[in-house]
Amino acid sequence: MSILLSAAVSLLSASALAVPNASPGKDASKMTQIQASSFARLALKAVQKEYPNKPEHVQNSDMDVRGPRALHPAFYGSFDWHSSVHGHWMLVRLLRLFPDLPERQQIRTMLEGHLTAQNLQAEADYFIQPNRQSFERTYGWAWFLKLAEELHGWDDPDGKRWSSNLRPLTDTIVARYLAYFPKQTYPIRTGVHPNTAFGLSFALDYARAVDHKPLQDLIEERSRTYFAKDAAIPAAWEPGGTDFFSPSLMEADLMRRVLSPKEFQAWLRGFLPGLENGEPKTLFVPAQVTDRSDPQLVHLD
């Protein structure tokens, strides 16, 4: 279930549903309510399903030998923490886009039970325990800030309360960004979770949405430092065997946010020469998945 949810969220976030400053009214035209209901049912089942679960958990003592729900009372469901977080984001987004969604009350009931002040404080407390400074860095961090951004922009009484409840963990993750990225000398260009461009993209969206100038300035500076001089990326080598990102397109997706339109056009021509002619072909042809039951190979789907 969590693998299918990841695929669903990838589709949603690649569409207008995750475009910064997008209008819910305009976004809704890109998806039917029947499709939205299908995604909603998928996520509702996943975020309330505790097992199977693959925790990224450092145990500091015997007291830390606990199950997912005890460790993460808000985000225990799905295969891992970040999948639970982006499942919650998708459900909030669907509520905003489709206020008459048949599953709307189920979604609100679940969110009311998960996104309590007590649960979110426990999630924040988990982050600050010893030896957990790299927990979910930066994929889970980015998805949590996307959830925080979604709730921040929602004019809804429940949404405002849930947004407030997120604040302890939101502040913790923002502080992690501000502390970590000045120390990361080189970007991570992998096609999976640690991808630096992805981690910066969603965080930049959040920073701009809430007008967090220090975070915005840091991300824009780091993005230019890491990527502004890149040219002729070997995108023909993509995809890697277990990628769910295109490293080249993810980098371009970040730089379109950072550069002016004129700068970006010039940068993209040098970064992906031949793109306007359909080259490299690997970026235009779906990857082949030989075994969808394999949790790594299915990343390609």
Would you name each region that the model predicts?
Residues 28-33, 68-85, 125-142, 183-196, ...:
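Solvent-exposed loop and edge beta-strand segments that line ligand/cofactor-binding
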Residues 24-76:
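Low-complexity, Ser/Thr/Pro/Gly-enriched N-terminal "stalk/linker" regions
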Residues 14-22, 252:
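Boundary at the C-terminal end of the N-terminal hydrophobic targeting segment
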Residues 41-44, 48, 52, 73-77, ...:
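HEAT/HEAT-like alpha-solenoid repeats
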Residues 69-73, 85, 92-207:
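Extended ligand-binding groove/face enriched in aromatic
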Residues 208-301:
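Long, repeat-rich segments with strong aromatic
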Residues 2-15:
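Bacterial N-terminal signal peptides
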Residues 26-36, 52, 94-109, 151-170, ...:
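Structural helix-adjacent loops and short alpha-helical linkers that scaffold large soluble proteins
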